Amino acid sequence: MSSILNVIEKLKLNVLNVEDVPESFSSDVYKLTLANGEKVYVKIPFNKDKLYREFQMIETLKDVIPVPKVLDFWDGDEITTGALLLSAIQGIPCTEDIDEKLSFQIGVFHAMLHEVKTPGYGYHVTDGFKILDQNNWRLHIKGNFEKWKEPCKEILDPELYERCILHFDGVFSALPEPDGSCIVHMDFRPGNILVNDNKVTGIIDFESARGGSSEIDFTKINRYIWGVNPRTKLPYIDGYRTIRPMVNLETVLPFYDFYDAFSAVVWCKNRGVEKNQSFLQENISTLQKSVGNEQTRY
């Protein structure tokens, strides 16, 4: 709470009420009611790179898809990483039932996001856009997996871990040529898609967005929308294809479902296994399904 009070002071906000937004898993997000009755959001990112990344992505996308307006920006001090003051968008996260009509719209907006080109494969940091080593997406994906091996080894059952290592080599080599580089959200899920009256009104949370291949961006949609209601898959794809071609989902989805779960195990280790136990178990279960192993230890 001291961080938000620090931000309120630095941005000289006249605030009536402060509410924590619990759905934010990485950064701290607060909903403020100002003295004039206006609702705004303050986002305090986990680190300074995420602060600049979110700011740059919102600025890039503001005339492309519905995103929050950046009302103010503070680059932080020795106590707080910094903060974004964001406008409120009318709507709520679409975590309830998603029908075919809404799924079509989500597909359209997701494709519009992917149509925005980036200077290369890479991401925004505090001092600009950092291009990946050799501007090579496949090298980046393989490098990430190598980096995650050691922390995953400490969490996963040894047999499951070994199966994961073998599984990666097989599915990685089968991937098609990446498309890109374009903006990928990296956390495109119902909680970050705002709707009102069954219409998409906003896309939020760009702190992990970067220049990548669109193939990485369908994992959460597959898990939390198509997996819950399979009837939403075709309308989504139809909506997406009104803007741009769809990648070969049959090839890329199994790989990225596995890759995303392996990454999430590392995230849980870094952020605390105990407090992220259910999320850890969800991802261990995904790994088990991917490689066909039902044993775990943690």
Where are these regions (language model features)?
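Alpha-helical scaffolds flanking conserved acidic
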Residues: L249-Y256
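An alpha-helical support segment within catalytic cores of ATP-dependent transferases
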Residues: S2-L13, E115-M186, R241, N276, ...
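ATP-binding pocket architecture of kinase catalytic cores
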Residues: E19-N135
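Active-site activation/catalytic loop segments of kinase-like enzymes and analogous catalytic loops
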Residues: E215-M246, F258-E274
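Conserved N-terminal boundary motif of the eukaryotic protein kinase catalytic domain
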Residues: K12-D20
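Active-site acidic catalytic loop and adjacent metal/ATP-binding pocket
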Residues: V29-T33, V42, R163-F218
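Short beta-strand segments
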Residues: Y41-P45, L71-D72, I183-M186, I204, ...
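Glycine-rich, phosphate-binding/catalytic loops in enzymes
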Residues: I58, L102, G202, T219-I221, ...
